[in-house]
């Protein structure tokens, strides 16, 4: 009975505190929260669409209570600018739940670190050492190796009789490029052979990534109401097991590289070698090195494949745009060689298509939460210290106040007006902005552009037999990142000489 009374008293105290807080502050409008759980069970599976719908009713800034935590969601470019520029310093911390706390070793990485000396240090490592133009250029042959390997696989499979009518599932090929590219950049290892078979270490890597996404996407009551966690001990065990599994694999790879560096007395350009070389100079702990490596993997693997799949779906759905891109290829690159990243600057319409794809289909449509480290006002409303603020990037990109015909896929809009997408224009924010803008934005843009351009230069893409372009399912799957609900299927017809469909291997 005493435990029951304590529980009742605790609940009453929490409810009373929240009521007093709501009388004291002027919060943004939003759906009415329920006691204890807030709006947790009002949120629909595709979260960013749910918040967009609520914004249509309540306005471009809304309150969403997840448990006892206030989450403020903004859905306009003007308010995004307030969050990411005008009040950037007060909103530069991160909210970490149990999964991200475990993943980041209490914020010892970059993505989940609070703003402070540690964040400034590891951000400096990323911008001055890891994602420099020089290093990205030195790693370019890896990217070109992987996209040409993809072209070779598509060419082989599209000529099989059983695929000529039903087409190919593009996700398989794009996922292989993203997987091989990020593991080679981060770890210097290609876990997948030429036949697409993944080795034992690679299977473990993929399992860790998949399990981490499942844990990270949790909306369970225990994840958001800390004082109920004792009721879910299995969750704590799952987080601990996942962290140990990830660290075991990463330490083994780090040890391999340490031994290789000792034998060769030199470091390669892979990120693991760079971080091990910089360890003493920047005073990087093992937890920070592991955290940074996995930040790059989680931020750079699925997101690139997802964006490229959406872009290709738009090409199949909009044959006019596909044809216009291919006409530009034929003028600039021709039909007697394969294109390279050096060609991108001479392909303005291709760049517009990439921008339009990022606008309509940002890989992380709901920006990772910024936590307030002080009381702040956004849009005239009070945001108390400790609140979470989200920018609904997907909604901002569909705001008719700043985009003409926002739901239309029309790359020409970027020929009419040059819009930056690396954090300087708050209408287009696929990589965030301000202090927490993604340091690897250019790498992501290069890889998506490379995957897309090679597929379009080498092949004409049409829907499977019996499917009309307008029948392609353009709905999203629930999750932190936006996979297409139905993987896009398409028929590939080669358009270049057959000797241009071979992989250009690079051993590094």
Swiss-Prot record:
Required cofactor names: heme
KO phenotype (gene knockout): Dwarf. 91% and 97% reduction of the levels of scopoletin and scopolin respectively, but increased levels of skimmin, the beta-glucoside of umbelliferone. Altered lignin composition and increased susceptiblity to fungal colonization.
GO CC terms, sorted: cytosol; endoplasmic reticulum; intracellular membrane-bounded organelle; membrane; mitochondrion
One example GO MF annotation: oxidoreductase activity, acting on paired donors, with incorporation or reduction of molecular oxygen
GO process annotations (BP): coumarin biosynthetic process; flavonoid biosynthetic process; lignin biosynthetic process; phenylpropanoid biosynthetic process
Expressed in which tissues: Highly expressed in stems, roots and siliques. Detected in leaves flowers and seedlings. Highest expression detected in differentiating xylem.
Positions of heme binding: 438
Protein's membrane topology: Single-pass membrane protein
Induction remarks: Up-regulated by wounding.
Compartments reported by the entry: Membrane
Alphabetically ordered keywords of this record: Heme, Iron, Membrane, Metal-binding, Monooxygenase, Oxidoreductase, Transmembrane, Transmembrane helix
Record field: transmembrane: 1-21
Keyword Transport carried by entry: no
Entry's EC annotation: 1.14.-.-
Job of this protein: Cytochrome P450 which catalyzes 3'-hydroxylation of p-coumaric esters of shikimic/quinic acids to form lignin monomers. Can use p-coumarate, p-coumaraldehyde, p-coumaroyl methyl ester, 5-O-(4-coumaroyl) D-quinate and 5-O-(4-coumaroyl) shikimate as substrates, but not p-coumaryl alcohol, p-coumaroyl CoA, 1-O-p-coumaroyl-beta-D-glucose, p-hydroxy-cinnamyl alcohol, cinnamate, caffeate or ferulate. Has a weak activity on tri(p-coumaroyl)spermidine, but none on triferuloylspermidine. Hydroxylates preferentially the 5-O-isomer, but can also convert the 4-O- and 3-O-isomers with a lower efficiency.
Database matches in PANTHER family: CYTOCHROME P450 98A9
Family assignment from sequence similarity: Belongs to the cytochrome P450 family.
The protein's name: Cytochrome P450 98A3
């Amino acid at each position: 009975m005493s435990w029951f009374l304590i529980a009742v008293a605790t609940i009453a105290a929490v409810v009373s505190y929240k009521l007093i807080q709501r009388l004291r502050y002027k919060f943004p409008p939003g759906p009415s929260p329920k006691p204890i759980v807030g709006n947790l069970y009002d949120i629909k599976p595709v979260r960013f669409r749910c918040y967009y719908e609520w914004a249509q009713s309540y306005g471009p800034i809304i309150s969403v209570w997840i448990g006892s935590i206030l989450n403020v969601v903004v859905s306009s470019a003007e308010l995004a600018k307030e969050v990411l520029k005008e009040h950037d310093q007060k909103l530069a911390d991160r909210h970490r739940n149990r999964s991200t706390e475990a993943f980041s070793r209490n914020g010892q990485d970059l993505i989940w670190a609070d703003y402070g000396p540690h964040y400034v240090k590891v951000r400096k490592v990323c911008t001055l050492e890891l994602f420099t133009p020089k290093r990205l250029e030195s790693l370019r042959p890896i990217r070109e190796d992987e996209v040409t390997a993809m072209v070779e696989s598509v060419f082989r499979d599209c000529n099989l009789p059983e695929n000529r009518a039903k087409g190919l599932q593009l996700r398989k090929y794009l996922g292989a490029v993203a997987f091989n590219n990020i593991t080679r950049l981060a770890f210097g290892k290609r876990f997948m052979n030429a036949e697409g078979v993944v080795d034992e270490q690679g299977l473990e890597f993929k399992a860790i990534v998949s399990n981490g996404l499942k844990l990270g996407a949790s909306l369970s009551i225990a994840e958001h109401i800390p004082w109920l966690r004792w009721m879910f001990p299995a969750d704590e065990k799952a987080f601990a097991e996942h962290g140990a599994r990830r660290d075991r694999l990463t330490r083994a790879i780090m040890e391999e590289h340490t031994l290789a560096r000792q034998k060769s007395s030199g470091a390669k350009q892979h990120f693991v070698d760079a971080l091990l070389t910089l360890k003493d100079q920047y005073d990087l702990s093992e937890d920070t090195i592991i955290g940074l490596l996995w930040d790059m993997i989680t931020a750079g693997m699925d997101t690139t494949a997802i964006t490229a799949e959406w872009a290709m779906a738009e090409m199949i759905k909009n044959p006019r745009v596909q044809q216009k891109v291919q006409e530009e290829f034929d003028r600039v690159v021709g039909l007697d060689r394969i294109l390279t990243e050096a060609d991108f600057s001479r392909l303005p319409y291709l760049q517009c298509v990439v921008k339009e794809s990022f606008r309509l289909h940002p890989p992380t449509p709901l920006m990772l939460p910024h936590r307030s480290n002080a009381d702040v006002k956004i849009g005239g409303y009070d945001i108390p210290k400790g609140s979470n603020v989200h920018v609904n990037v997907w909604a901002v990109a569909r705001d008719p106040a700043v985009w003409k015909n926002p739901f239309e896929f029309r790359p020409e809009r970027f020929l009419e007006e040059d819009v930056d997408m690396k954090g300087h224009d708050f209408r287009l924010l696929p990589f965030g902005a301000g202090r927490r803008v993604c340091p690897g934005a250019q790498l992501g843009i290069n890889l998506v552009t490379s995957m897309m351009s090679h597929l379009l230069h080498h092949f004409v893409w049409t829907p499977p037999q019996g499917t009309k372009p307008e029948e392609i399912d353009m709905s999203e799957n629930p999750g932190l990142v936006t996979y297409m609900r139905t993987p896009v299927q398409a028929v590939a017809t080669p358009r270049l000489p057959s000797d241009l469909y071979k992989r250009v291997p690079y051993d590094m």
